[in-house]
């Protein structure tokens, strides 16, 4: 039975539902206009035949972009990301990801971000709301069965072990190495948020461990080697190297004999099987689609006065530049440059009003540097009915910026331990009255 995920995006439009009586999606048509996404259309696969879906929205001026999914080559849609305008409710841009590739961002990547995706699932149908534009999208998901690889190493010795075909991901792997051979393995699996542990072999030697930051990270490949080894008189594993989606690596043992690689592009390793005796004789993998969940965003309350209009840039992948405009009595304007998940630069709106002095710029050494805290001051100054921000100072994982403005009034700090700042919100008029931040856990 398909799982229905509620529509994400803005409010507005009339409800539509393509249903879920399909095997998958094979083609997507999107047209963007000046107000955002004008229409969207999906072609589905049912009993091996293409089903032409209806248009949702209105076909106006603009260029239609298409994204094809080769279902004949076992390609399928796993997730969607996009942005919508909170004021109009219209989706501004959208991007699709399969187990093989990712589409271009269709439309303009501005506004509030949304996403649709479930680990180990694929999208087979859509529903949502539209009128003259597309306001929101929801999807139907079904679980994708893991694919089992062949075994690498000894094929007939020892006894069989087989775990992971029904698990969502891997949280930890422990490997024991005695200086010659891989003797023992323990794997902590995740199943619907619960951890299940399995181990096999003889725990003799030095134990190594890799902790996977699931669901934000996965194991993407395992390299290794095997050889006929004494005193066991059979083929056993001599080395293993685990690699993750975050670029981390754990190397165990010395490459000896026949080398192998367990990897499936676009998929994560979610389990292992093989044979084991006094040593781990062989190893194989289970592969499944994996779209790392974005770290949960937390909005920290703004600090300062209550004047001006509210604004919110939202949360992004990281901050690249900070622009600060100063006046005679405090900070008059700020603007931020971000990078989104599609590695595209997003320049935020100006909040406040700059003077002839223009902006000072604090540029980060992205992607190696990120903001960990924001310090500042606010005070009630001449010419302002409510408090204004008088000083801002940014701390990163590498350094501290100079203070921008005057340290006068009430001090404040915006930070959360083991988190980084990825977006800003606040209140402004012709001055900056209040500022707050969006933070996410540090996963690097």
UniProtKB/Swiss-Prot annotation:
The gene is JAL41. Residues 2-143, 146-289, 297-441 form the Jacalin-type lectin domain. The modification N-acetylalanine is found at residue 2. Belongs to the jacalin lectin family. PROSITE patterns: JACALIN_LECTIN (PS51752). PANTHER family: JACALIN-RELATED LECTIN 22-RELATED (PTHR47293:SF58), JACALIN-RELATED LECTIN 3 (PTHR47293). One of its GO terms (cellular component) is plasmodesma. This is Jacalin-related lectin 41. The lineage of its organism: Eukaryota, Viridiplantae, Streptophyta, Embryophyta, Tracheophyta.
């Amino acid at each position: 039975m398909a799982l229905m995920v509620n529509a994400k995006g803005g409010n507005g439009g009339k409800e539509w539902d393509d249903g879920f009586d399909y095997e998958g999606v094979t083609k997507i048509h999107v047209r963007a206009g000046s107000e955002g996404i004008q229409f969207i259309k999906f072609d589905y696969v049912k009993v091996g035949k293409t089903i032409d879906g209806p248009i949702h929205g209105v076909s106006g001026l603009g260029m239609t972009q298409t994204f094809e999914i080769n279902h004949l080559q076992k390609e399928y849609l796993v997730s969607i990301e996009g942005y919508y305008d909170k004021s109009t409710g219209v989706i501004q841009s959208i991007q699709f990801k399969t187990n093989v590739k990712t589409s271009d961002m269709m439309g303009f990547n501005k506004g509030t971000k949304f996403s649709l995706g479930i680990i180990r699932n694929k999208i087979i149908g859509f529903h949502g709301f539209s009128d003259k534009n597309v306001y929101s999208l929801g999807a139907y998901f079904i679980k994708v069965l893991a694919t089992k690889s062949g075994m690498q190493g000894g094929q007939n010795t020892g006894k069989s072990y087989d775990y992971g075909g029904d698990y969502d991901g891997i949280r930890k792997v422990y490997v024991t190495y005695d200086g010659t051979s891989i003797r023992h393995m323990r794997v902590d699996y995740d199943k619907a948020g619960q951890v299940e542990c399995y181990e096999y072999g003889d725990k003799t030697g030095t134990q190594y461990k890799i902790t996977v930051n699931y669901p934000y990270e996965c194991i993407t490949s395992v390299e290794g080697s095997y050889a006929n080894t004494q005193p066991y008189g059979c083929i056993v594993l001599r080395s293993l190297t685990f690699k993750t989606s975050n670029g981390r690596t754990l190397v165990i043992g010395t490459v000896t004999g026949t080398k192998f690689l367990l990897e499936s592009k676009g998929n994560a390793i979610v389990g292992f099987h093989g044979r084991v005796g006094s040593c781990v004789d062989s190893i194989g993998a289970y592969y499944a689609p994996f779209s790392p969940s974005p770290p949960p965003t937390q909005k920290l309350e703004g600090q300062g006065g209550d004047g001006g209009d509210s604004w919110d840039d939202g949360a992004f992948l990281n901050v690249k530049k900070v622009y600060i405009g100063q006046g005679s009595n405090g900070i008059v304007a700020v603007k931020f440059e971000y990078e989104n998940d599609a590695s595209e630069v997003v320049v935020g709106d100006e909040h406040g009003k700059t003077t002839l002095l223009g902006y000072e710029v604090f540029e980060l050494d992205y992607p190696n540097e990120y903001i960990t805290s924001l310090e500042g001051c606010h005070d009630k100054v001449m010419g302002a009915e409510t408090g204004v921000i008088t000083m801002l100072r940014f701390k990163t994982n590498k350094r501290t910026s100079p203070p921008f403005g005057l340290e006068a009034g009430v001090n404040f700090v915006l930070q959360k331990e083991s988190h980084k700042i990825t977006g800003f919100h606040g209140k402004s008029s012709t001055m900056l009255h209040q500022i707050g931040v969006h933070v996410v856990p540090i996963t690097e």
